[in-house]
Regions:
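Hydrophobic helix-and-loop "lid/oligomerization" segment in the mid-to-C-terminal part
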Residues: 1, 84-171
């Protein structure tokens, strides 16, 4: 956004969430202190900023009394942990379905659409992860994650409480 590569498609009908405000957007939702609005508001633009753990929490809180979002309440806990940086290493390395969904969404446009349509239809995350194409993507991502964990373990040294992972000799 800052580089201007999307300027021609951002207009007053564009909503931007969890990214720096764009002068052309109509709705900006953010929680980062660095993006807190002050006097420099944008004319004809709605800016929703709150000091919440995640930008998604702002949207969730705004809509939860207007539409039933109860099926997302558990997911929001994990979204807050991830976006707010309050997730522990053990939680991050764990097998929580929300985390695995987050790791596979966006890998392909087709699977992303399938995931979003199923969430919209209130299909549980566990059921979504069992869909054949999603399950295949998940298996590949789990194997990749194990490879990354093993590579880090094998190349990690701690010197004066500083963790150093040497990756320059990897093939």
């Amino acid at each position: 956004l800052r580089a201007g590569t999307m300027d021609e498609i951002i207009d007053r009908k564009t909503a931007i969430c969890d990214l720096p405000r764009h002068p052309n957007c109509g709705l900006s939702i953010d929680h980062h202190k660095s993006n807190e609005p002050h006097e420099n508001t944008i004319e004809n633009s709605i800016i929703l900023w709150e000091p919440t753990p995640s930008a998604a929490r702002i949207a969730y809180n705004l809509l939860k009394n207007k539409i039933d979002l109860s099926d997302l309440s558990e997911t929001m806990i994990w979204v807050d942990k991830l976006d707010g940086g309050s997730i522990s290493i053990d939680e991050f390395k764990g097998n929580n379905p929300v985390l695995w969904l987050g790791r596979v969404i966006g890998e392909s446009e087709e699977n992303t659409t399938t995931i979003l349509e199923n969430i919209q239809n209130r299909v549980s995350i566990e059921e979504i992860l069992e869909l054949p194409d999603i399950k295949l993507e998940l298996r590949e991502r789990m194997a990749k994650q194990e490879y990354l964990n093993r590579t880090i373990r094998e190349n990690l040294s701690i010197i004066d409480r500083l963790a150093i992972v040497r990756l320059e000799n990897l093939k």
